[in-house]
Amino acid sequence: MASFFSSAGSFLITVLASVFVFGIVIFIHELGHFLTAKFSGIQVNEFALGMGPTLFSFTRGGTKYGLRLFPIGGFVSMEGEDEESEEAGSFTKAPVGNRILVTVAGAVMNLLLGFVVLVCVVCSQQLISTRTVAEFYEGSSTQQSGLQVGDTIVAVNGRRCFIANDIIYEFARTQQGQADLTVLRDGKRVQLDNVVFDTYEENGVNQLVIDFKVLGEKKTVGSVLKEAGNWTLSLGRMVVLSLTDLITGRIAVNNLSGPVGIVSAISEASSLGLSSLLMLLALITINPGIFNLLPIPALDGGRLVFLIIETIRRKPISQKYEIAINAAGFILLIGLMIFATFNDITKLIV
């Protein structure tokens, strides 16, 4: 019986944590579109959080605000956004600069939310990890390869490291057990080629061994903001690199995760504490902030491409063509989500 209540409690925490994470990420994104549309004089017909049947709604200032049953999405419906409209306040009648602002605002809000969450994460830490080597473990392979105490790791394989976590991420990406490091030593840049680090296999996956510790520094207002900013840049770059690795085949497509995988990750993070959940929230909110700006039809980035073309041509592309292209992109994204969800379920079963 105790085991049952424990499992039920764990399930409830996962559900609540998932609703919280998805809800706040979607709400902030749509809020960006909503606020900039209102600021630009564009008529917003509806602002809804969630999908499916409406649980609660009210109308104010010509806009219907609603909460829907399934916490898996949300939307801002603007006049003339997806159909021809001659009404005052139509999206298509607004200056192209205003429409660009409305289009990118959702992604910008996601990135800002990620930064704010990361400020909270950094504040919860006792010290801020630097990129300066403090000590090595006994038999350290990196030390034997030339890395020294006091070295500040600037780049791995030519890619700049903003935070200590970047070092781990770049080591993991090499998949070769060695990397080229650029370090600051006594104020001078030193290049260390073929620095070896240990790996081991666990459940068919190569795991990385970091055989040194880095220095920690005390927190100040400036250092917290700087670290949170660097974390934001780092996570954003990780999203871009991961997408690039998927496209180039560096990472197998069966590693792609969808909503089920995200819920599983939220479950694990929530069991580890608030700090881990907040870190995952930061990654999940920065991810759509970057992904939504990709030039893919049906995404904000796809609409941005149309607006840029309109700016260059000085006239818009026919809306019927834009709608058709966006519909094709939407079908593609749904197919990708189904594939990712199938991957997630397969991993859970296996």
Please tell me what each predicted stretch does.
Residues 2-12, 81-97, 105, 109-256:
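PDZ peptide-recognition modules
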Residues 8, 47-48, 66-75, 100, ...:
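Hydrophobic alpha-helical segments of integral membrane proteins
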Residues 10-86, 294-313:
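Small-residue-rich helix-interface/hinge motifs
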Residues 17, 28, 39, 46, ...:
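Internal alpha-helical transmembrane segments
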Residues 22-26, 77, 110, 114, ...:
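Alpha-helical transmembrane segments of multi-pass membrane proteins
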Residues 56-58, 135-138, 307-324:
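Membrane interface segments of multi-pass transport proteins and intramembrane proteases
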Residues 245-249, 284-299:
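Transmembrane alpha-helix interface/packing and boundary motifs in multi-pass membrane proteins
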Residues 339-350:
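Juxtamembrane boundary at the C-terminal end of a transmembrane helix
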